[in-house]
């Protein structure tokens, strides 16, 4: 037996495409590509990354370990990964006007956990928007580390209009004197008053942390208030409205907090950063600095408002009465259908959405009375306001027919064909991977 691998073995290892090496995985990827090509994606937390972002993410950088920060690594051979990480950092700081940035968090949840570690100790009090009112798990929800490691106090929204109850938030802050006040959400469609959060944080001696995961792209385009100048720490994902690879980021203008953040990310939470993902982030941040990206975000906002208006005109109850962002929360009770059922029916018609609790929801969390809709992904493929109004019509027809046993299947099948025809007018990737 030769001590060396054969040349044919090496050629296959370094050059053979996925379909030759693993047909089973290749088939799954191609079927997912078909699903994305032929379906309308309305999940507000999803988007479509550019092919350039995916190419960077599927690069040789996946081979490289790089624990530490640029210029201060625990491994050799980091000259090129240092360059790409510094590029990502510099671009990110330019986008949001931040003094310091960490691009290493593997996810938004990791970014939030690192921010909590930098700002507080286990047992400290944290004040965040409740999950039931549109907050995120990582903002103090009981099942999450943020609700287990910290004394979590939750504010909510007003029953009469679904808007954040700032008076309640301020009263709770004065009563509990939290170490951190969290502003941000996963299902809140309106602009957040960061100045009011900053004022009460200063009054009670709290840090202000803003999670802008959902609206970061709109901030980058100047269409949503920038929280970075007012927050002690700002976190975000990179794959929602920022339209990049899946991952997280942390921003601050405070040099002392920057050091704490860096230590919290590594060695506090993570080992080696995912350098191939950081390369994808660098590409996405470069795109976010372009005029095209700003125009895209304007369409994201206009399209969300068009969809909300169309659904409202068709008898749907839009929580808060509209949207200031990419996101719409729909109360389905006037249509007498649950979020769980609506999600399943829409998926059969080629429209992907997610069931979502509405404020003061009487249904269980896995059933819900609402659905959450978002415009980023369909806007990325080219849909405009007219197409989003068509989507609103399709949603109405399918969900209305769902209550008519004799007609539901035929309507769903017809709308599914309309969905595929609409999607073919706005094609996306022609292959599943770079």
UniProtKB/Swiss-Prot annotation:
Its EC number is 2.1.2.1. The modification N6-(pyridoxal phosphate)lysine is found at residue 240. One of its GO terms (cellular component) is cytosol. It comes from the Bacteria. It comes from Gluconobacter oxydans (strain 621H). GO terms for biological process: glycine biosynthetic process from serine; tetrahydrofolate interconversion. GO terms for molecular function: glycine hydroxymethyltransferase activity; pyridoxal phosphate binding. (6S)-5,6,7,8-tetrahydrofolate binds at residues 131, 135-137. Homodimer. InterPro entries: PyrdxlP-dep_Trfase, PyrdxlP-dep_Trfase_major, PyrdxlP-dep_Trfase_small, Ser_HO-MeTrfase, Ser_HO-MeTrfase-like, Ser_HO-MeTrfase_PLP_BS, SHMT-like_dom. This is Serine hydroxymethyltransferase. Catalyzes the reversible interconversion of serine and glycine with tetrahydrofolate (THF) serving as the one-carbon carrier. This reaction serves as the major source of one-carbon groups required for the biosynthesis of purines, thymidylate, methionine, and other important biomolecules. Also exhibits THF-independent aldolase activity toward beta-hydroxyamino acids, producing glycine and aldehydes, via a retro-aldol mechanism. SUPFAM superfamilies: PLP-dependent transferases (SSF53383). Pathway: One-carbon metabolism; tetrahydrofolate interconversion; Amino-acid biosynthesis; glycine biosynthesis; glycine from L-serine: step 1/1. Its cofactor is pyridoxal 5'-phosphate.
């Amino acid at each position: 037996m030769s001590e060396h691998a054969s040349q044919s073995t090496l050629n296959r290892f370094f050059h053979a495409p996925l379909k030759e090496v693993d047909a089973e995985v290749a088939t799954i990827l191609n079927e997912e590509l078909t699903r994305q090509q032929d379906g309308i994606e309305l999940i507000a937390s999803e988007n479509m990354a550019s092919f350039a972002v995916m190419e960077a993410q599927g690069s040789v950088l996946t081979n490289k370990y790089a624990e530490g920060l640029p210029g201060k690594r625990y491994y050799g051979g980091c000259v090129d990964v240092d360059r790409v990480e510094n590029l990502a950092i510099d671009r990110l700081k330019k986008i949001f006007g931040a003094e310091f940035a960490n691009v290493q968090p593997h996810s938004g949840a990791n970014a939030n956990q690192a921010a909590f570690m930098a700002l507080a100790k286990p047992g400290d009090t944290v004040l965040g928007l409740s999950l039931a009112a549109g907050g995120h798990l990582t903002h103090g929800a009981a099942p999450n580390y943020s609700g287990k490691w910290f004394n979590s106090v939750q504010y909510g929204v007003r029953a009469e209009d679904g808007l954040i109850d700032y008076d309640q938030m301020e009263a709770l802050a004065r009563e509990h004197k939290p170490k951190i006040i969290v502003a941000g959400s996963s299902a809140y469609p309106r602009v957040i008053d960061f100045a009011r959060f900053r004022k009460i944080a200063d009054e009670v001696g709290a840090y202000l942390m803003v999670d802008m995961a959902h609206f970061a792209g709109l901030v980058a385009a100047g269409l949503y208030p920038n929280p970075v100048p007012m927050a002690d720490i700002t976190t975000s994902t990179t794959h929602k409205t920022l339209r990049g690879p899946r991952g997280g980021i942390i921003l601050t203008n405070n040099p002392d907090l920057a050091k704490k953040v860096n230590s919290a990310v590594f060695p506090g939470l993570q080992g080696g950063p995912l350098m191939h993902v950081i390369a994808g982030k660098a590409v996405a941040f470069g795109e976010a600095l372009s005029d095209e990206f700003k125009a895209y975000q304007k369409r994201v906002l206009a399209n969300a408002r068009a969809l909300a208006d169309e659904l409202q005109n068709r008898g749907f109850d839009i929580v808060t009465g509209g949207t200031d962002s990419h996101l719409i929360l729909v109360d389905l009770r006037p249509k007498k259908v649950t979020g769980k059922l609506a999600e399943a029916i829409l998926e059969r018609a080629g429209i992907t959405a997610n069931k979502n609790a509405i404020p003061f929801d009487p249904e269980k969390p896995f059933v819900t009375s609402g659905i959450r809709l978002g415009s980023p992904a369909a806007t990325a493929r080219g849909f405009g306001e007219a197409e989003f109004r068509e989507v609103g019509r399709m949603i109405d027809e399918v969900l209305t027919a769902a209550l008519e046993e004799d007609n539901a299947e035929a309507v769903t099948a017809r709308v599914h064909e309309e969905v595929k025809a609409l999607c073919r007018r706005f094609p996306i990737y022609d292959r599943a991977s770079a």
